[in-house]
Swiss-Prot record:
Protein known as: Protein MobA
Superkingdom of origin organism: Bacteria
Biased segments, Basic and acidic residues type: 118-149, 262-284, 309-325, 348-374
NCBIfam families: TraI_MobP_relax
Protein keywords: Plasmid
Pfam families: Relaxase, TraI_middle
InterPro entries per the UniProt record, alphabetical: Endonuclease_MobA/VirD2, TraI/MobA_relaxases, TraI_M
Origin organism lineage: Bacteria, Pseudomonadati, Pseudomonadota, Acidithiobacillia, Acidithiobacillales
Length: 409
């Protein structure tokens, strides 16, 4: 594949990499994997091209890495997949794979296969509530905390849309811990100290549209902005307040320590620079008339010594920064934290909050009795038995399922 790729001397990178991921619990057979690759490559128009793929099971979701060589093996021409819009073609391929193999559709899939076998664009519901950008939703999933963008959408946008004057807009936003400020040619809606692009909250919240409706922008007049507390994305999550308090304390301490370290290191760099300059100045104050060769030799010696001093200081600072990173490791996400608190059931509830988790229901309850289940390590916890997948050395990993007597979650 590499040799063929190098034949395309005018194209630097002719190998595209894609990742196809199945939902947790979905187990494609080898035949289905082969079929999925064929459908995917056919939809992208590269069915005759070279490809390498492999199925990985190192995460909770089985996923397939697929590398496709865009150089045609016979014509040696470089194919521009879907005129450069290969991701759009990939969305179509996913819809066809889901339809052919019966997998659950992606929540935000762009396409679906119609009854006549043709692809149809998923209907966009204009009345559907606006959602934060994907990175913000990812952070919400990790921490359980509403992002500033979501708060701007849910709390800020309604206030902005109903405001009749700039004074009313600033006053009502301030009561909710927000402020609307002109920034450059646009505007930013601040939720606490976190800025959100105003148009991300609502199309009608942009500066241009508000100025058409309310007149020229008027800044707030000494407005007292209320203090906002962190808000959970889902109400009544057990332990969430303790989790988010610990998380914020962790990063507050980390940032404070980093500021002290940066200030100290900057002072050390400045001090070394001053010392080295003083030494060079002292050298030049001597009488070097007629001793040019000696002066140049001394300059070389001092330059080498000072370069070594700078390198030593740089290495020292790098070690300090690494110690800082080790001391303040990333705080666990909410699910990990719940498992660390010996609450696997709560962790599973959070993990599957958007769907009904798989479970087995019986017709009677039994006392907690460890069962010999291959590859799993049982542990009695109260009136339950927690089963963890065995790792190397016989140790148990994270809890996989819980036997509650009458039901298994």
């Amino acid at each position: 594949m590499i040799a063929l790729s190098q034949e395309a001397v005018r194209s630097k990178d002719t190998i595209n990499h894609y990742v196809l991921s199945w939902r947790e619990g979905e187990q494609p057979s080898p035949e289905q994997v082969e079929e999925a690759v064929s459908i995917f490559m056919d939809e992208l128009g590269v069915k005759d091209h070279q490809a390498i793929y492999g199925l990985h099971a190192d995460t909770d979701n089985l996923h397939l890495h697929l590398a496709i060589n865009r150089v045609h093996p016979e014509t040696l021409k470089v194919v521009k997949i879907n005129n450069g819009f290969d991701i759009e073609a990939a969305h179509k391929a996913i819809a066809r794979i889901e339809n052919a193999q019966g997998w659950q559709r992606e929540q935000n899939g762009r396409y679906q296969v119609l009854e006549n076998g043709e692809l149809g664009r998923e209907h966009i519901d204009k009345d559907k509530p606006r959602q934060p950008a994907q990175p913000k939703r990812d952070m919400e999933n990790r921490t359980g905390e509403k992002s500033a963008e979501r708060i701007a959408i849910e709390d800020g946008a309604p206030i902005i849309k109903k405001a009749q004057t700039w004074e009313q807009l600033h006053r009502e936003l301030a009561a909710k811990g927000m402020r609307y400020e002109k920034t450059g040619s646009g505007a930013t809606l601040f939720v606490g100290d976190v800025g959100v692009k105003a148009s991300s909250a609502d199309r009608d919240a942009s500066l241009s549209k508000l100025q058409k409706r309310l007149g020229a922008y008027q800044p707030p007049q000494r407005q007292q902005v209320a203090q906002r507390e962190p808000e959970p994305i889902k109400p009544d999550v057990p332990g969430w307040k303790d989790y988010i308090t610990g998380r914020k304390a962790h990063y507050s301490e980390k940032n404070a320590d980093k500021l002290v370290q940066d200030k100290r290191q900057e002072q050390e760099r400045k001090q070394l620079a001053e010392q080295q300059k003083a030494r060079r100045d002292e050298l030049m104050r001597g009488n070097w008339k007629g001793k040019g060769e000696v002066l140049n030799a001394m300059r070389s010696v001092i330059a080498a010594e000072q370069a070594a001093e700078k390198a030593a200081l740089k290495e020292k600072h790098q070690k300090q920064r690494e110690q800082h990173r080790q001391q303040f490791r990333p705080y666990p996400d909410l699910e990990q934290w719940q498992r660390m608190q010996k609450s696997p059931e709560l962790a599973e509830q959070w993990r599957h909050r958007a769907s009904e988790p798989q479970r087995i229901e019986g017709d009677r309850s039994e006392p907690p009795t460890p069962r010999d289940i291959r590859a799993y390590q049982p542990e009695i916890v109260g009136q339950q038995v927690h089963y963890s997948r065995k790792e190397e050395g016989g140790r148990g990993g994270g809890v996989s399922f819980v036997d509650k007597g009458k039901s298994i979650d």
